Design a protein with these regions (language model features):
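Sec-dependent N-terminal signal peptides
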Residues: 3-14
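Hydrophobic transmembrane alpha-helix bundles
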Residues: 27-28, 32-33, 40, 94-103, ...
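Conserved polar/disulfide-associated segments of primarily extracytoplasmic proteins
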Residues: 68-147
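Flexible, glycine- and charge-enriched loops at secondary-structure boundaries
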Residues: 4, 94, 181
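Short, well-structured beta-strand
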Residues: 134-199
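A short, structural micro-pattern
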Residues: 59, 76-78, 166
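N-terminal targeting sequences that direct proteins away from the cytosol to non-cytosolic compartments
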Residues: 18-64, 69, 175-199
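Generic detector of solvent-exposed, compositionally biased contiguous segments
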Residues: 41-69, 125-159
Length: 199
């Protein structure tokens, strides 16, 4: 009887897993508002992330690419932002951010067919929190740029927010190799300023 019960539970798991709908980033309806400026690219995929499965979260990554993010001659090169919409109350600090982004960009470089013998170096610190943030961080990511085939240092701002129901955590990353005084940061900042927990 015990064996039969185990077989039944196993079969139920297999059936429910097989019936789980595959995530479709193009049709997925976000329950929050994150602006999509004209001519900016949008991409969404599930977390855990295929190329960085070591990052221990469950949710969705929602990306906004500037029009020139993949053009080496553009002031917008490597300038983009992404939101992690995560299950639960996720704890984070500067060290966790460093580790997560190190795994993330190591995996991204590998996924683009580049040898990752050159380490990804991430350095972050907590700073005075922005309005409505639970925590705010800034730092840098030094890595091999798989598009330009050379080392690049990307500046990064990180915002953490937990909305009223406290069942989701939002971690928003703004990224650009341009200094924080450059005008591109106004566009990236605006994405977070205009963010709303609900549509």
């Amino acid at each position: 009887m015990k064996i039969l019960a185990i077989l039944f539970l196993s079969l139920s798991f297999v059936i429910s897993y097989a019936q789980a709908p595959e995530f479709n980033g193009r049709t997925w309806e976000a329950p929050y508002h994150l602006s999509s400026p004209a001519n900016w690219g949008v991409e969404r995929f599930p977390i855990p992330i295929d190329f960085a499965p070591q990052i221990p979260y469950k949710g969705v990554e929602d990306i906004r690419f500037t029009p020139g993010w993949a053009k080496a001659a553009s002031d917008e090169f490597w300038s983009y932002a992404f939101l992690w919409y995560l299950e639960g109350d996720v704890k984070t600090d500067a060290k966790i951010i460093e580790n997560n982004l190190q795994q993330y960009y190591h995996g991204l470089i590998t996924a683009n067919g580049i040898d990752t013998s050159n380490a990804v170096i991430t350095t972050f610190k907590e700073i005075a929190k922005d309005t409505h943030d639970v925590k705010t961080f800034n730092g840098t990511i030094q890595m091999f740029d798989y598009m330009a085939k050379q080392t690049i240092v990307i500046n990064c701002k990180v915002h953490v927010k937990i909305c009223k129901n406290k069942t989701k955590t939002f971690i928003f990353y703004e990224l650009s190799p341009k200094p924080l005084s450059h005008i591109i940061w106004q566009s990236l900042d605006a994405l977070w300023t205009e963010f709303k927990c609900k549509k």
